A protein has these predicted regions:
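Fe-S-dependent hydro-lyases/dehydratases of central metabolism
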Residues: 1-726
Length: 726
């Protein structure tokens, strides 16, 4: 038998990764070049602006830009459409693919037009997952896409691979979200699959239609895994055939002897209808468990909310229980996970000849692309939904990130979308608002709608699903999508709106580093939605200074003011007018202001779960942030964002208590030499407000050679500027 390392090479995962590793070796590190890239309208402006400042000439690989987030253009005057116009001009200038507003959500366009078996796609969205179609997808912050645009690589340690073994077949009423929520619940808290690749196989795969597989696959992001891949079969071949790309299919199977670092077994026969309660997809129960003990379970959610928000909000979920039944206020079926043809078809079957009624409960459905929307219209699905009282809306990611269908205060929305993080649905706790999202499968949402808003498992009702299989019509994309790859026109002028601004100046690290704590968060996990809110805030994504005004605004409202004060004092220091208090603090550790960087710092137990959006890090940098300190980073992508924006990703040992407060200082001597010299830790000093000095060991490994230089230079743009001068 081969050794484990030899047999790991026989996984589908390693077959694809090694084929994309420019080093061509079988070592412990990989330098990956991707086949294509995806971005949406929250991220592509910043990526292109960064790439331009770093020497971009043209797009070297297919790069599709979709407009599915701020595509309603409902807030901020012209700024959202200004970004869309910029995107089209960039596609023309540099040779990109431009998908106009509301034609498709980012990941459905990739499934329809971009994926190929054995390929790899990098996306500036955390839910970049196409493994069910034989294409490994990776979600990262914009800096990693910039590297690919400049013909550089995605550098990773060779990952572990976990086998997800599927058996059985789901019964009627069970959908992909039920399986996905169960998977997230099983592995999230333990970190069992963190930064690993999930490889799906087993006899149960053949029993799942493509939309079902896609629905599970897209949610693997919520497990904190690195990527995913599935075995391919006739069902996958059919997907490529109907999308008129049969040449992009090939069979993918592991070798005869393949080694996996772990295994998850899922018996689809036993899958129950699920509900993930606020404030995470892992906070999951079977719907029957909720029905059996609703007051206790909902009271636990209330208590969690009070711990998070204190007296800023008033929450009353238990009032949703009436006569032992739990009532929802809103239902949503949307986005890359929810708005599939099969989900909408089965929801329509459940609601056929039913009514959602005329009371408080409302429901909306968002087909995930225009081809899917056209098929629901052609096949009578839209008619059945509309007759039941469902509002049908365009391909739009709004309900998934707080830019559409924000519920009423204290409202409970059940959604087939990807996340239910705090305030991600759009509520503003600073204004006393709170609304809550529970994740459910489209089938159970439809059953709930048919039952007047009483939360109901679709397995508990009778219905017949008789809709025809999906047929894809390419005409709308042929007519509307700008296909510019290999057709760049460098004479094309980029079109700028008044909100599109360049990045402000960022400084290299000096010999020493003094940090002032501007936020200390002891929540178990801090999401990127808390670090920088989504929703209407993201309309300012192309204006770094204006967007940074919202950093941590829903979790630590005083953070921006503190950071601005720290940044102002650092600028005075750089101008030779160092504030006396900074001189005094440095004197306590025998240092001076001339060779010591000064910036703000965020401490959180486990930051970075959720979105890949680089603004979670860049906004800190724009405000003068120089470091994060934590016990561990929730995801690789957030840590990479920190590095690419020159924020040193410190960690501390798990047995060390971090009992410091905003206004305390952390001094890190010799940090520049430590980073450039290949060291992995530093002996720091905490200077507390009362003058007490405490030792603190900080770790910052692993870092590649390039990442060390990026940190020393202050950010990725500075790094490329320095390279271009050589």
């Amino acid at each position: 038998l081969p050794t484990p390392d030899e047999a790991r090479e026989n996984t589908i995962t390693y077959g694809i990764l090694r084929a994309h590793d420019v080093d061509g070796s079988k070592g412990d590190s990989m330098r990956i070049k991707f086949d294509a890239m995806m971005s949406h309208d929250i991220t592509y402006v910043g990526i292109i602006q960064t790439a331009r400042a770093s020497g971009l000439e043209k797009f070297p690989i297919p790069y599709a830009m979709t407009n599915c987030h701020n595509s309603l253009c409902a807030v901020g005057g012209t700024i959202n459409e200004d970004d869309h116009v910029f995107g089209l001009s960039a596609a023309k200038k540099y040779g990109g693919i431009y998908v106009p507003a509301n034609q498709a959500v980012i990941h459905q366009y990739a499934r329809e037009m971009m994926v190929k078996c054995g390929n790899m796609i990098l996306g500036s969205d955390s839910h970049t997952r196409y493994g069910s179609l034989g294409n490994m997808g990776v979600g990262e912050g914009g800096g990693e896409l910039v590297k690919q645009l400049l013909n550089n690589t995605w550098d990773i340690k060779a990952p572990e691979v976990v086998l997800v073994w599927l058996e059985g077949s789901p019964r009627k009423g069970i959908g992909p979200h039920d399986v996905a929520i169960s998977l997230v619940k099983a592995v999230f808290d333990s970190g069992f699959v963190k930064n690993k690749v999930l490889e799906f196989a087993g006899p149960g795969v053949k029993n799942l239609p493509i939309d079902f597989r896609n629905g599970i696959d897209i949610m693997t992001t919520e497990t904190t895994c690195l990527s995913s891949i599935w075995v391919t079969d006739e069902e996958v071949k059919h997907h490529y055939d109907i999308h008129q790309r049969p040449e992009d299919y090939r069979e993918l199977r592991p070798g005869k002897v393949a080694y996996y670092d772990g295994m998850i077994r899922i018996d689809l026969d036993k899958q129950e209808a699920m509900i993930a309660l606020p404030f995470h997809p892992s906070n999951a129960y079977t719907i029957h468990e909720l029905q059996a003990d609703p007051e206790r379970i909902l009271r636990e959610v209330e208590e969690d909310a009070r711990k998070r928000f204190g007296d800023k909000i008033s929450i009353d979920l238990v009032s949703k229980v009436k006569d032992g039944k739990v009532y929802a206020d809103q239902g949503i079926i949307a986005g890359c996970s929810g708005g599939t043809y099969d989900n909408l078809a089965e929801a329509a079957s459940i609601l056929k000849d039913q009514s959602v009624g005329n009371d408080y409960f409302t429901i909306s459905a968002y087909p995930q692309s225009t081809p899917v929307y056209m098929a629901t219209t052609r096949d009578g699905i839209a008619t059945e939904l509309l007759e039941a009282g469902v509002v049908i809306k365009p391909a739009f990611c709004g309900p998934c990130f707080g830019a559409g269908d924000v519920p009423a205060n204290n409202g409970l929305s059940i959604r087939h979308t990807t996340r239910n993080f705090p305030n991600r649905e759009g509520s503003k706790p600073g204004q006393g608002q709170i609304s809550l999202v529970a994740l459910m499968d489209a089938r159970s949402i439809a059953a709930t709608a048919a039952n007047g808003g009483v939360i109901t498992a679709a397995t508990d009702i009778e219905y017949t699903n008789a809709h025809k299989p999906y047929e894809y019509d390419p005409k709308i994309y042929e007519r509307r999508v700008f296909q510019g790859f290999h057709k760049e026109n460098l004479d094309e002028e980029l079109r700028y709106g008044p909100n599109i601004k360049d990045w402000p100046k960022m400084y290299p690290i000096q010999e020493n580093m003094l940090l002032e704590l501007a936020a200390v968060i002891h929540d178990p996990v801090t999401t990127t939605d808390e670090l920088i809110p989504s929703g209407e805030t993201s309309s300012y994504r192309s204006n770094p200074l204006k967007l940074s005004e919202f950093a941590l605004s829903r979790r630590v409202p005083e953070y921006v003011g503190l950071s601005k004060r720290i940044q102002k004092e650092d600028l005075e220091r750089r101008d030779g007018r160092c504030p006396e208090k900074i001189v005094d603090v440095l004197a306590k550790v025998g240092a001076g202001p001339g060779d010591t960087s000064f910036g703000s710092c965020v401490f959180a137990n486990r930051p970075g779960d959720g979105s890949a959006r680089e603004q979670a890090a860049s906004c800190q940098k724009v405000l003068g942030g120089d470091a994060n300190i934590c016990y561990e980073y929730a995801t690789k992508r957030y840590r990479s964002n920190c590095i690419n924006w020159g924020i040193v990703p410190f960690t501390i040992d798990k047995d060390v208590k971090f009992e410091y407060e905003p206004g305390d200082y952390v001094f890190v001597p010799g940090i520049r030499d430590a980073i450039l010299g290949g060291k992995e830790e530093a002996d720091a000093k905490v200077i507390k407000a009362d003058g007490t000095v405490v030792d603190l060991k900080l770790h910052f490994a692993p870092l590649t050679k390039d990442e060390r230089q990026i940190l020393a230079d202050g950010c990725l743009m500075n790094y490329y500027a320095a390279q271009n001068k050589k």
